[in-house]
Swiss-Prot record:
Alphabetical list of Gene3D superfamilies matching this protein: NAD(P)-binding Rossmann-like Domain
Record's keyword terms, sorted: Isopeptide bond, Oxidoreductase, Ubl conjugation
Binding-site positions, substrate: S151
Protein name, entry field: Putative short-chain type dehydrogenase/reductase Rv0148
Keyword Ubl conjugation: yes
Organism: Mycobacterium tuberculosis (strain ATCC 25618 / H37Rv)
Name of one Pfam family that matches: adh_short
GO CC annotation terms, alphabetical: peptidoglycan-based cell wall; plasma membrane
SUPFAM superfamilies according to UniProt: NAD(P)-binding Rossmann-fold domains
Cross-link named Isoglutamyl lysine isopeptide (Lys-Gln) (interchain with Q-Cter in protein Pup), sites: K280
Entry's family note: Belongs to the short-chain dehydrogenases/reductases (SDR) family.
PANTHER family: DEHYDROGENASES, SHORT CHAIN (PTHR45024), SCP2 DOMAIN-CONTAINING PROTEIN (PTHR45024:SF2)
Amino acid sequence: MPGVQDRVIVVTGAGGGLGREYALTLAGEGASVVVNDLGGARDGTGAGSAMADEVVAEIRDKGGRAVANYDSVATEDGAANIIKTALDEFGAVHGVVSNAGILRDGTFHKMSFENWDAVLKVHLYGGYHVLRAAWPHFREQSYGRVVVATSTSGLFGNFGQTNYGAAKLGLVGLINTLALEGAKYNIHANALAPIAATRMTQDILPPEVLEKLTPEFVAPVVAYLCTEECADNASVYVVGGGKVQRVALFGNDGANFDKPPSVQDVAARWAEITDLSGAKIAGFKL
C-alpha cells in the first residue's frame, strides 16, 4: 500500500520524545518530514535549534528526507511559517501531527492565569494555528490527514493538570468538527492519547512503568493515521505499552419527558437517566 510514501508531513514538537519517534517513523516509511521544535524546556521557556537539527540529521543519515523548523506553534505567524517551510522545501503539505506541548502542573487552587494560559496557547491554540495554516492546502488538493495529541488527562482527568486536561480535551472537540467539515475534501482528523516515557512524563510515572512505555509502541499508530488507506475519522485512540484501543463517548436511552419536568420529576427518574448498562456509542438527537 502507498502508506505515507512521498507525502509531506509536519510534526510539531518533534525534537524529542514522542514527536521525534513520530518523525523518524514517518520518514522511515517514505514521508518527507518537517521537524518542528522550538527547542525550549518542558515548561515552554527558552528556545534553540539543536533538538530539531539532531532529528533531521538522524533522518538524513538513514536516507530520509527532512527539514528543521524552529517556530512556535503558539503564534499565528509561527504556525504559518511552519507550513511555509513544508511548501518551500517539499512543495506541498499532506498531513499534520499536532504534537507540540508543554507542562505547567499545579492544583486548580494554585493555578495562576499565566500557567493556565501558557498551556492552552501551546496545546489548543497551537493546534488551531498550525491546522488553520494547513487547511486551505488540504482543501485545494482534496486531501489531508490530521492527528492531534490528546491525553488521558483530558479524557479521564488527572490530579494537578486542569490546564493540560482542558487543552487536550479541547483538541478532541476540534477534530470532531474538522472531521465533519473536511469529509467532502478527503480530510480526516483523529486524536491519539499516547502513554509513553518522555521528558514530559519522567517524574510523573514510576521507573518500572516508564521502562515499558517506549515511544516506539506509539509511533506506528500515528503513522497509520497519516495514510490515505486509513478511513477513520473523528476517532480517539489511547496507545501505549503495546496496547492500542479506541475510546468514545457513550450514551444510554435516557428519560423522555412530555412536558417540562419539575425538579422532583428529574429526581424520580435519576436512576434511569444515569444507568449506563445499555449504553451505546453516543450521538445526540431528539
